[in-house]
Regions:
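Amphipathic, interaction-prone secondary-structure segments
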Residues: 35-77, 82
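Extended aliphatic helical segments
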Residues: 12, 32, 45, 67-70, ...
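A short, surface-exposed interaction/processing loop segment used at functional sites
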Residues: 77-107
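Generic marker of "main functional regions" within proteins
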Residues: 26-33, 91-92, 97, 118
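Negatively charged, low-complexity tracts enriched in Asp/Glu with abundant Ser/Thr
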Residues: 2-48
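C-terminal partner/receptor-binding element of secreted or periplasmic proteins
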Residues: 102-120
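Hydrophobic transmembrane signal anchors and adjacent membrane-proximal interface regions, especially
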Residues: 3-7, 77, 82, 112
Length: 120
């Protein structure tokens, strides 16, 4: 099941917290034990870098997504959600949403479809 992010936020940190809450709510609908649901909620790791905030699950063992945390990115606005290209870098082919503006779908597995130009 997919959760639609609707709220808007002033800070990237608040937007990320809201998105993680939505991913946790989506995981609640997954057919796993209560123990696994509790562990999933506890194992998020957020790492702020100079250009991106990296979001990880499994106590930092799995890269989940990236959020642009600067105002001067040449392609994306601050708060833009990007999927992972790999462990340490985002895929910069298109936005998956914006944690400050809302209006995008998310599920527990990570950022979904492209939003805007080039979207599906």
């Amino acid at each position: 099941m997919t959760i639609n992010i609707k709220k808007t936020f002033e800070t990237v940190d608040d937007g990320i917290a809201n998105m993680i809450d939505a991913a946790n709510a989506d995981y609640e609908n997954f057919n796993v034990s209560d123990e696994m649901k509790a562990r999933f909620k506890e194992e998020w790791v957020i790492k702020n870098g100079s250009k991106y905030t990296k979001i990880m699950t499994n106590n930092g063992g799995t890269a989940w997504g990236f959020v642009v945390n600067v105002d001067d990115d040449k392609k994306f606005k601050k708060g833009t959600l990007l999927k992972c290209a790999g462990w340490s870098a985002p895929e910069r082919n298109g936005s998956r949403g914006n944690v400050l503006e809302g209006g995008f779908p998310i599920n527990w597995t990570g950022p979904l479809y492209l939003v805007g130009k080039g979207s599906i």
